[in-house]
Amino acid sequence: MTMDLPTTDDRPVWDLWLSMYHAPAVTAAIELDVFEALATAPATHEELARRLKLSERATEIVLPLFAALGLLSRYDGRYQLSDVARLYLLRGSPYDWGGLLNRMGPSSPHHAAIREALKGERASTTGAPGDRPSDAWAAGHVEIEQARVIAAFMHSHSIAAALGMARNVDFSGVRRLLDVGGGSGCFCIALAQRIPQLRCTIMELPAMCEVAKEYVSAAGLADRIETGAVDMFRQEWPRDHDAMFFSNILHDWDFPTCARLLAKAHAALAPGGRVFIHESLLDDSGAGPLTTATFSLVMLLGTQGRQFTYAELAKLLGDAGFTDVGATPSYGYYSVVRATRR
């Protein structure tokens, strides 16, 4: 079954989904005196984390969100209050919204999760470490029931982006593509529909491979898309592909782990091989965009990673031995960062 590109992109649905995190992030920050501290003096995320004894990673993630919400601005690496925050979020202001916001905050489960993440006490909305979605991949095992849930979740918010990417990004010259952590296989499906000569491999954990086969079969592409049961951290990667593809994979992991994955991609490619990274990119300014900054907060709560700027991905790729780095907007809030193996 061939799927057509939707007539409008899915940004409004992304906005709707992620808006549920905005107020809880603000109320958690109010409770932890983030805005009061910045009223005293502008600060980098490292300085603010030290001043308030907060998690540096969590602070780095939430400050761009507050900038995108118009509550902070960033100058010379330091964040400072906007007029809106100074008027309406400080306890000493006659216009303080605290009477409403402080009452509303505890009613949201996201408030507690974000507060605890900022304090460095909790890394997941789902409970203790071990319950995060990325932990199954870190452990190298996922049960078939969990694989079905994860695949459905990922497929639902990725299929439109996959179809758009297949239309808008240049994959010319690619004959065999390895989709690292390919989930339901929606990106391979979209690319195979678009490029008749392309053959793809979905590299996943065994249970995810079984689920991906169902999606591929339903699309009528089992003759050109195969699966490979490989633990991306512990096993060697296939070396018979001329391109590697990562979608929403690197944002699950810290920088050393991302460097390790890109090094494995480099080792598995011949010179001239290509890598494609599909992510929603943060602005280099540290002020959003709003939906991507909120998505980064979701990564804080459910993974070990966060969203990247283009410059950060370009450096990771360069350090791994890739060259000719560039980026192309692909669909909705997404872009594809591409590079070539030396």
Model-derived segments and their meaning:
Residues 4, 10-32, 36-42, 50-51, ...:
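Conserved Class I S-adenosyl-L-methionine-dependent methyltransferase catalytic core
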